[in-house]
Amino acid sequence: MHDVEAGLHPWIAVLDFKSMYPSIMIGHNICYTTRVDPTQDIQPAEDDLIHMAPTGAKFLHQDTRKGLVPLLLEDLMSQRDEHKAGMKKAKEDLDDKALQFHDAMQYAVKILMNSFYGVFASGFYRFTHRDLGSSITAWARHNIKAIIASLEEEGHSVVYSDTDSIFVRSPVAADSISVLKEGASDEEIENWNNAKQAMVDFGLDIAQRFSKDSAILEFEKGLSVFFSHGAKKRYVGQVVWPSEEMLIRGYETQRTDTFSYLRDTMKQMFNYALADEGDDLVQYALSRVQAIKNKQVDASELVLSKSCKGKLNKDGSIDFTKHYANPDSMAQVRIARALIAKGLGFTPGMKVAYIVTDASNRPMTVEPWIEGEENGGISGYDGIFYAERLAAAIGRITEAFGWTAKELVAGNRQTSLFSF
């Protein structure tokens, strides 16, 4: 939709379309029962109201015939609104059980609503047509692009957008600060609070002005600062409204197949990035990579884990060939076999923990990490492997400050005639 602009951006209002695809289906009456088939003799009269998608597909207006799917979606959307209201009341009443119930229910309804698009866009559903799925996505793109164009005409900078969200820079005062550092003065705190309120007012105003029946825009959250190295769906920001938390999307801190040392490193680097402390960020990144390269990091912070499938035979043995074409090449399979050999037990589908001890071998040498044993029961770890993996992850961030992954591992930057 709109590629993310690399760098640091202060005071970002994040606007989100409420149940975007279901809203489009309701607003434009999209259904197999309302699609106008151009091959049929009977067509709508010239003065009949119709919905025409950007693709050219036509759907009967609600006044002519209400679609079955839009009817169902309206009921589901009403149910979700009820549960959201229940969540709000539960928060006010400090009722955790009611809050969990309504939150689970609204999420379940959301998943059910979104599944309608998946069915429409599939080829196996009997009552569908390719016009349905393509019309929904075309209207979604149209809505996003139209709002971005209007915002930019008004002089607002859109720094990023995806399927159903828009990140736009708020028109706060030019001297506004976006980062409150420890020991900030009363004047700085007041400056920051004024900027925050200006962002909230801006976000609420934009949401109200650009909402319509088929595309309800909500001011989802406000960020005091937003950072990305320029890759799609990879960004981090400091949320200050309606709650206070760090927002991380697309980076390795969100993945379950990484190791804790990497996650902790990235989180601290995000703190430096959002505070606009580029020099400290680079120095911290260098120190973390060099520490792991020189094997100065405790192995417990380098544990990797993966799920391992297998078929349990009648005799109690495990057959891995049913799930893996070449099981001996899979680290998790070799770890599972090592656990079985040690008499520690293995259940198909469970996660196994391990350490890479020598990545230069093919396949690389791994050892099971066994909690309770000294040093996890391993002989050591491959510092170069972990340093390179860490550098590859955080190098996406440090590149914005002039340092590549290779330079982080080397510990210095290469220079050329063009560097001077």
Regions found by a protein language model. Name each.
Residues D41, P54-H61:
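Conserved, carboxylate-rich catalytic/transport cores that coordinate ions
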Residues D48, A53, Q62-R65:
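Intein modules and their embedded homing endonuclease domains
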Residues G56, T64-Y125:
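Active-site cores of enzymes that catalyze phosphoryl transfer or operate on phosphate-rich substrates
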Residues D47-I50, K58, L71:
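Intrinsic-disorder/low-complexity peptide segments enriched for small residues
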Residues M1-P38, I42-D47, K91-K97, F101-K110, ...:
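DNA-dependent DNA polymerase catalytic subunits
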Residues V119-S134, A138:
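Gly-rich Lys/Arg/Thr-decorated short loops/hinges at beta-loop-alpha junctions or inter-strand turns
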